[in-house]
A protein has these predicted regions:
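Alpha-helical metal-binding/catalytic segments enriched in His/Glu/Asp
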Residues: 119, 133, 137-139, 143-192, ...
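Conserved aromatic anchor
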Residues: 382-394
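Extracellular fibronectin type III
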Residues: 438-470
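N-terminal capping segment at the start of a domain
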Residues: 23-70, 320, 330-334, 338-340
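Active-site-adjacent mobile loop/cap segments within catalytic or ligand-binding domains
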Residues: 54, 218-236, 285-366
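Beta-strand-rich modules
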Residues: 423-444
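Metal-dependent peptidase/peptidase-like ectodomains
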Residues: 185-296, 304, 308
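A non-catalytic alpha/beta surface segment that caps or lines the substrate-entry region
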Residues: 45-122
Length: 471
């Protein structure tokens, strides 16, 4: 896997491009502050959050909003209070907002307010650049319209909400140049409405969303087939942008980019983070927007033109998803316990997934923004010229290339405060290329593939879009 490499301004100015490329393998490959975060997530905190969320009985989007002890309203109030408590502990560093919209639809037959609970930690250097982590607060049973029966939703998706609350706690006392957003969404099971609420809010506020890390079903390590795996996590990412125009698609068909959307390169970034800091957790990149025929709250972000990925456990147990609480009595399922209860959560595994998210957000928030205006030239030549626009906060840049069938970046060359480089004897036809920006203290951005297919700049959203089904 590609690793996150560190270099200093002194190295940039004192060492030639060629020498830097040769010495890349000897450059320190981690940051001490990130190394400390790797083991920081607390299983006790995660368990306490899920226990509390389960105690509200059901968190169905159409459940009670006025009770203090049951329903989605009580759950929202508790999450809001938890964020506010974390903010008090860091001297008011977090702002809590509750954007909402009213929807009707196939799974919302009457007008229903869908409210998100969002914690915002402003960046000190680049506050309009935003890194988002999401999970959904609502839960359901077998009948998606049943808002009365108990629906504990311990793994789907109290696990994701617990992870983002813990990430907010850990990062509340860390420095961040970009803004960090931690959002407990509602309305996911009824049609991804909470994701749309937050994506619309981001657009209205003019946020430059670098990514949404959507964590949904991240706490179970035992699959329905008996497979046990607490050492890997799936990261789903789209290959081409959801709102790609016909003109952009035509250009891509000639120049490539089918597997290099910003979301895909964000997945590669997360894999690199895990490889560097979490030797006991492997990122399994999945070349899909979501699981087959299913969806999640990352989809509204993609539809709005923002990069986004979905983080999900490696082996799901469908007896614990979207199920009434019951014990099987038929010949096929006698004795099987159905329902998404807390005993199905592996808290050590959830802590490792939480660490992956926390590290990714910390690294992204300290790195410069990804380069813009990346282009390549080299038709009818044996060398390739890579160009880009400089970004604020970058001390240097790194050019990457890989075989067109390779899943990860294979080669790299570090350059100083430049806006182009000529790769000698690297034929443009045979490789995919990208550029990342690097700060003076060694934090690196995701890699940007050339042109519209790989740009992290928000794509124009289509005039109208419809949400994918709930997962």
């Amino acid at each position: 896997m590609n690793r996150l490499h560190i270099f200093s301004v002194a190295m940039l100015t004192a060492i030639s491009v060629g020498a830097m490329a040769q010495s890349a393998s000897t450059v320190p490959s981690d940051q001490a502050s990130l190394q400390a975060l790797a083991s920081a997530p607390s299983e006790t905190e995660l368990r306490a959050t899920i226990t509390k969320l389960v105690s509200f009985g059901t968190r169905h989007t159409m459940s009670d909003t006025t009770s203090k002890t049951r329903g989605i309203g009580a759950a929202r109030q508790w999450v809001k209070a938890r964020f506010e408590s974390i903010s008090r502990d860091c001297g008011g560093c977090i702002e809590v907002v509750t954007p909402s919209q009213t929807f009707t639809g196939k799974r919302l037959p009457t007008p229903t307010e869908v409210m998100d609970v969002v914690a915002i930690k402003r960046g000190k250097g680049d506050p309009n650049r935003v890194i988002v982590m999401t999970g959904h607060l609502d839960s359901r049973v077998t009948d998606v319209m049943n808002s009365k029966s108990d629906a504990p939703g311990a793994n789907d998706d109290a696990s994701g909400v617990a992870a983002l609350i813990e990430a907010s706690r850990l990062l509340s006392k860390q420095d961040n140049q970009a803004t960090l957003v931690f959002a407990a969404l509602s309305g996911e099971e009824q049609g991804l409405y909470g994701g749309k609420v937050l994506a619309d809010y981001a657009v209205a506020k003019g946020w430059q969303v670098e990514t949404d890390l959507n964590n949904d079903i991240v706490g179970n390590s035992r699959g329905q087939n008996g497979a046990i795996d607490n050492t890997s996590v799936r990261v789903f990412s789209e290959g081409t942008k959801s709102n790609e125009t016909a003109t952009q698609a035509t250009a891509r068909s000639y120049h490539g980019g089918e597997v290099d959307s910003p979301s895909r390169n964000m997945a590669r970034y997360m894999a690199s983070v895990a490889d560097t800091y979490l030797p006991d957790l492997r990122v399994h990149m999945i070349y899909r927007t979501d699981r087959y025929g299913r969806g999640g709250d990352q989809v509204p972000f993609l539809q709005a033109g923002f990069p986004a990925v979905r983080v999900t456990e490696s082996h799901e147990d469908y007896t614990h998803q979207h199920q009434d609480l019951r014990t099987g009595t038929s010949d096929k399922d006698r004795g099987v316990r159905y329902g998404d209860t807390i005993d199905g959560v592996d808290f050590h595994y959830l802590a490792r997934v939480t660490a992956l998210n926390t590290l990714t957000m910390a690294a992204l928030s300290r790195a410069p923004a990804p380069p813009t205006g990346v282009t390549i030239e080299g038709a009818l030549a044996t060398d390739t010229t890579v160009k880009w626009n400089k970004v604020a906060g970058a001390a240097g840049y790194r050019v990457h290339w890989r075989d067109t069938t390779a899943p990860q970046w294979q080669h790299q060359q570090s350059v100083g405060d430049e806006d182009h480089v000529v790769l000698k004897d690297v034929v443009i036809d045979d490789w995919f290329f990208g550029v990342s920006s690097v700060s003076a203290d060694g934090y690196e951005s995701p890699v940007v593939f050339p042109g519209d297919p790989g740009s992290f700049t928000r794509s124009p959203a289509p005039a109208s879009s419809s949400s994918a089904p709930g997962h």
